[in-house]
C-alpha cells in the first residue's frame, strides 16, 4: 500500500462574532492510498497557512509541501512518514503551523491504519 495523495479541505463558517472563537475554520486532511483506503485528520490552526504547507507544489531546491513529501510512502509506516515530513519541511520550519499540518497528516495515518487493520483507533 502506498500514499497516492494528501488532500487539504478547508472549512470556514461565513461569519463569527467573537474573533477568538475557535470554530471559525478548520483544515481537514485526507490521506489517500493506491488500494482505495482513506484516512481523515484535522488541523485546528491557521487553516490557510496549513493548507499551503500541505499543498505546496514541488519547487527548486527540494522545497515542496507535505503531499509531495509523503506521496509514494507506506502509510502504515507512520514513523517513516514522520521522518520524511521532518526531513522535507526544513525550509519552512518544524514548529507552529508546520508541525500542526504534520500532526493532521499523522491523525489521518492512524485513522487509515485502523481501517486497514480492522481495529479501532
Predicted regions and their residues:
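Structured beta-strand/loop patches that form or line metal/cofactor-binding pockets in enzymes
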Residues: 1-40, 44-47
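Metal- or metallocofactor-binding catalytic centers and their adjacent structured scaffolds
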Residues: 32-116
Amino acid at each position: 500500500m502506498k500514499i497516492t495523495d494528501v488532500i487539504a479541505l478547508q472549512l470556514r463558517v461565513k461569519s463569527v462574532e467573537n474573533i477568538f472563537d475557535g470554530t471559525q475554520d478548520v483544515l481537514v486532511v485526507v490521506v489517500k492510498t493506491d488500494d482505495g483506503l482513506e484516512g481523515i485528520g484535522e488541523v485546528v490552526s491557521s487553516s490557510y497557512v496549513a493548507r499551503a504547507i500541505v499543498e505546496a507544489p514541488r519547487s527548486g531546491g527540494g522545497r515542496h509541501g507535505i503531499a509531495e513529501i509523503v506521496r509514494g510512502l507506506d502509510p502504515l509506516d507512520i514513523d517513516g512518514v514522520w521522518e520524511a515530513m521532518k526531513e522535507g519541511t526544513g525550509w519552512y520550519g518544524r514548529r507552529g503551523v508546520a508541525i500542526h499540518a504534520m500532526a493532521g497528516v499523522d491523525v489521518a495515518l492512524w485513522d487509515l491504519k485502523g481501517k486497514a487493520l480492522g481495529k479501532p483507533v
